[in-house]
Swiss-Prot record:
Phosphothreonine carried by residues: 524
GO cellular component: membrane
PANTHER family assigned: CYSTEINE-RICH RECEPTOR-LIKE PROTEIN KINASE 17 (PTHR27002:SF1041), RECEPTOR-LIKE SERINE/THREONINE-PROTEIN KINASE SD1-8 (PTHR27002)
Listed name of the protein: Cysteine-rich receptor-like protein kinase 17
Gnk2-homologous domain location: 27-131, 139-255
Tissue distribution of the protein: Expressed in the whole plant, but preferentially in young seedlings and rosette leaves.
Residue ranges constituting the Protein kinase domain according to the UniProt record: 359-631
Lineage: Eukaryota, Viridiplantae, Streptophyta, Embryophyta, Tracheophyta
Pfam families: PK_Tyr_Ser-Thr, Stress-antifung
Entry similarity comment: Belongs to the protein kinase superfamily. Ser/Thr protein kinase family. CRK subfamily.
Length: 686
């Protein structure tokens, strides 16, 4: 019974010891002097996102990856690498486990690193400051074997040891040799060697530096590690020294990886009796030796069986939890059938949260009727604009589905590009390319910014909008009516080229369909055509009307939603321009900022085209194909325009002053009380 109890105690001891070795096999070094962050902060989220992708990034880059993610003070810099020759799956597992270990141990430190591995050697390092090319000696971490070289053998041992260390340091820090034999940067500074020692068998050594440092710095880092061993652990039978920029390990047995306890082969028996043989695993400084009597010795097979059973059990539990979690996530983000047809990428919510700083106010670009827009940056450095639809808006969900299906089918230089979407729980996100110069109205209606839009730029903007709408109506696979063309939905890129945005109200027409009706009218007052406002009827000619309003706004620099008095009548911009046309005083319309650098005949021709677009009868309005033709060919004679719709007559209740308004003041009216169902029609390519 006593023997059995002793065996149980020893089993428990070796069970704990085995986990002690496993914990050392993933040693993390957290820098407590570099700074800290709050859990779940933007920096923490960026760190988690970056490290969670490291395994695939490192293997994709042949064993070495150096990158960053985030913006400003929340930016995370990281490096990952494997020893040269590591199989991709082995390298991937090593990086994955090492990164996870750092996340679990370095809970709030802004800097940390870990050299680890059981089948191969790998490194993961992160910081809130760029460290590429800089030698990192601190913080350092070290381990040693508590057993020692016998004093009478020390001199002979040192002669072999010193020569081996010198040779290995020179080999590891020689980038010329390694670069000539390796396609991967991970092998730039790497060396391993074995030297026979007459008393203790073989001395095995592995050294490696990160490839971003110079050969001189690599040599310095490894020499510092050797000096550290000589000063503090000289005479020990094995040492591991870890620094941010280099790895140093030697043992009296051959080994794989960084901290494994597996012997590739047993060292040859010593020629004369020695003290008890060295431990097969490096031990931490407070580890003590256990002397086991013959009658209480437990077999290695029993220990292995216990460890295997426990490890397998833990793995099964973890796998079960992961499967359950993934099933739950799939249920939460299951998409409607119509979204599955979309040709766009579905982003994980955590990716978008990390890219936008968890939708921070600092990254907010603006807000609209159905949500807010944020700037962000993806892991690969791509800048994005994220539209976050309001959680309380029923119309937002309809528009979300509509926009994904519509925009996913479109590819044109004058249409904003949809990169993807995210639909998880209550979050509905649309991810677009980032367009740096905001929208047309930001410049056009600001007296201090309007001077940046000279006539050449404005003419180019009109031409780009024309090509974009023509693509929607005629040249794309689908016939699409935008229904919400306005200055705030025309974005401008870095070169002031226009991109049409916001397809939440867009409708897809059949091949032979020319007109559609809706019982619920939505849109912005002033841009909507008369037939759409009064009868709910829309077609390609509805977009033409909106385009005509845009032309008049671009040339005049005036808002269509403002009121203007002329000849005793109250006019919006469209009817005001018509009166100028009738009075042949079109020069009064031209924005003073472009009068000096434009040809008045050319500008008046553009106004003429704008008036043709806003005619009351849809049949009188030209198609976008015709508009494109007359804009690019000045020799084509234009027909005389007919009066536009929405005349404001000077009668009772028509004077804006009686409503508390003054001439030129914006009414800013929009039809928001009624919601269009925006039913998504079947997508049929032409």
């Amino acid at each position: 019974m006593a023997k059995t109890s002793c065996e149980i105690i020893l089993c428990f001891f070796f069970f704990i010891l085995s986990f002690r070795v496993i914990s050392v096999s993933a040693q993390q070094t957290c820098d407590n002097t570099a700074g800290s962050f709050k859990p779940n902060s933007t920096y923490d989220n960026n760190r988690r996102l970056l490290l969670s992708t490291f395994a695939s990034n490192v293997t994709a880059q042949n064993g070495y990856f150096n990158g960053s993610f985030g913006l400003g003070t929340d930016r995370v810099y990281a490096m990952g690498m494997c020893a040269p020759g590591a199989e991709p799956d082995v390298c991937s597992n090593c990086i994955k486990n090492t990164a996870e270990g750092l996340l679990q141990i370095c809970l709030n430190q802004t800097d940390g690193f870990s050299w680890s591995g059981e089948e191969t050697l790998c490194l993961v390092r992160y910081s809130n400051k760029s460290f590429s090319g800089l030698l990192g000696l601190e913080p350092s971490n070290d381990f040693f074997n508590v057993n020692e070289i016998r004093k009478e053998d020390q001199k002979e041992f040192d002669s072999v040891f010193d020569e081996l260390m010198f040779r290995t340091i020179q080999g590891a820090s020689s980038s010329v040799r390694n670069n000539s034999n390796s396609l991967s940067l991970s092998g730039k500074y790497y060396a391993k060697d074995v030297a026979p020692e007459p008393v203790y068998g073989n001395i095995s050594v592995v050294m490696q530096c990160t490839p971003d440092v110079s050969s001189k710095d690599c040599n310095l880092c490894l020499e510092r590690s050797l000096d550290f061993y000589k000063k503090w652990y000289n005479g020990k039978r094995g040492t591991i020294i870890l620094r941010p920029s280099c790895f140093f390990r030697w043992e009296l047995y051959t080994f794989f990886g960084a901290f494994d306890s597996i012997n590739a082969r047993h060292p040859p028996p010593p020629p004369r009796p020695l003290s008890p043989p060295p431990l097969k695993t490096p031990s931490v400084t407070n580890q003590t030796n256990i002397t086991k009597k013959n009658d209480s010795r437990i077999s290695g097979g029993t220990i292995a069986a216990i460890v295997v059973v426990v490890v397998v059990t833990i793995i099964l539990i973890v796998v079960g939890l992961v499967i359950c979690k993934r099933r739950k996530q799939k249920q939460e983000i299951e998409l409607p059938i119509v979204l599955n047809e979309a040709e766009s990428v579905q982003f994980d919510l955590k990716t978008i949260e990390a890219a936008t700083g968890n939708f921070s106010e600092h990254n907010k670009l603006g807000a609209g009727g159905f949500g807010e827009v944020y700037k962000g940056m993806l892991l690969n450095g791509t800048e994005i604009a994220v539209k976050r639809l309001s959680k309380t808006s029923g119309q937002g969900e309809i528009e979300f589905k509509n926009e994904v299906v519509v925009v996913a089918k479109l590819q044109h230089i004058n249409l904003v590009r949809l990169l993807g979407f995210s639909l998880q729980g209550e979050e509905k996100l649309l991810v677009y390319e980032f367009v740096p110069n905001k929208s047309l109205d930001y410049f056009l209606f600001d007296p201090n910014k309007r001077n940046q839009l000279d006539w050449t730029v404005r003419r180019n903007i009109i031409g780009g909008i024309t090509r974009g709408i023509l693509y929607l109506h005629q040249d794309s696979r689908l016939k699409i009516i935008h229904r919400d063309l306005k200055a705030s939905n025309i974005l401008l890129d870095a070169d002031m080229n226009p991109k049409i945005a916001d397809f939440g109200m867009a409708r897809i027409f059949g091949v032979d369909q020319t007109v559609a009706n809706t019982a619920r009218v939505v849109g912005t007052f002033g841009y909507m055509s008369p037939e759409y406002v009064t009868h709910g009827q829309f077609s390609m000619k509805s977009d033409v009307y909106s385009f005509g309003v845009l032309i008049l706004e671009i040339i005049s620099g005036k808002k269509n939603s403002s009121f203007y008095q002329m000849d005793g009548l109250v006019n919006n911009l469209v009817t005001y321009v018509w009166k100028l046309w009738e009075n042949k005083t079109m020069h009064e319309l031209i924005d003073p900022f472009i009068k000096e650098d434009c040809k008045s005949d050319e500008v008046i021709r553009y106004v003429h085209i704008g008036l043709l677009c806003v005619q009351e009868n849809p049949a009188d309005r030209p198609t976008m194909s015709t508009i494109h033709q007359v804009l690019t060919t000045s020799s084509i004679t234009l027909p005389v325009p007919q009066p536009p719709g929405f005349f404001f007559r000077n009668g009772p209740g028509s004077n804006p002053s009686s409503q508390g308004m003054v001439p030129g003041q914006s009414s800013s009216k929009s039809f928001t009380s009624s919601v269009d169902e925006a039913t998504i029609t079947q997508v049929n390519p032409r």
